[in-house]
Regions:
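N-terminal Lys/Arg-rich, disordered targeting/topogenic segments
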Residues: 1-4
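Hydrophobic membrane-insertion alpha-helices, especially the h-region
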Residues: 6-24
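Surface-exposed, glycine-biased beta-strand/turn segments
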Residues: 23-122, 155, 164, 193-207
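Acidic, glycine-rich catalytic/binding loops that coordinate metals and/or anionic ligands
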Residues: 62, 133, 145-154, 176-207
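A generic structural motif
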Residues: 95, 127-129, 180-182
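Zn2+-dependent peptidoglycan hydrolase active-site motif and core
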Residues: 105-149, 172-174
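Active-site loop architecture of trypsin-fold serine endopeptidases
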Residues: 123, 162-175, 182-186
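Beta-rich strand-turn-strand
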Residues: 144-171
Length: 207
């Protein structure tokens, strides 16, 4: 009797399995099975940096302007005090060995090549195509061969190399990188500072 009961149970289970299989395969053939959408993790959070052509690109489309430096290595030094608290640091410093390539963070026109011996040293000012932004690179060891004012540069293009010219400490070569929001008619030395850190690192500013 037990064998018969077990056999009946087995037949019922097998039948259910066949019905389930036929139903599922039929749904797939008819295209009625809903495929779940990929889960979105933190949809309102910042987009992480990506690698484009070997260059780290932040969520705002800006390249990290020092070759070989990853976004997670950046430190937010914007608004830190300098010179004993007499001035504010309106940029971020990206530490790197002397001679490391400095790359254009964004496309634009080289607006000014300037040597400020007591300030930024060997510097480059690049104006965005819409002229709303200025990208400032300072303390360079020197310029890339052939770089000239009025030249159009692309994102990731070599501008110069990391150094410590100007008022930088020779023991800590770095790129001083600033972004300024420009109003119509403003010149290369003007503009309103914007913190580059969250634009490059994909993180909120630390201050």
């Amino acid at each position: 009797m037990t064998r018969i009961a077990n056999f009946v149970v087995w037949i019922v289970l097998a039948g259910l399995a066949i019905v389930f299989y036929m139903g599922i395969t039929g749904q797939f053939r008819s295209g009625t099975v809903a495929v779940p959408s990929p889960k979105v993790i933190d949809p309102v959070g910042p987009r992480p940096p990506v690698i484009v052509g070997g260059v780290t690109v932040g969520p705002a489309g800006l390249a990290v302007p020092v070759a070989g430096v990853k976004a997670e290595q950046l430190i937010d030094t914007f608004t830190q005090s300098r010179a004993g608290g007499t001035r504010i640091h309106d940029a971020i410093d990206i530490m790197a060995p002397e001679g490391t390539p400095v790359l254009a963070a964004a496309p634009g026109k080289v607006e000014k090549l300037f040597n400020s011996e007591g300030g930024g040293g060997v510097t480059v000012y690049v104006r965005s195509p819409d002229e709303r932004w200025s990208y400032y690179y300072a303390h360079l060891q020197g310029y890339a061969p052939g770089l000239s004012e009025g030249q159009q540069v692309r994102r990731g293009q070599l501008l110069g190399r990391v150094g410590y010219t100007g008022n930088a400490n020779p023991q800590g070569p770095h790129l001083h990188f600033a972004i300024n929001r420009m109003q119509p008619g403003e010149k290369w030395w003007q503009g309103s500072p914007v913190n580059p850190y969250p634009l490059l690192a994909g993180k909120g500013a630390s201050r």
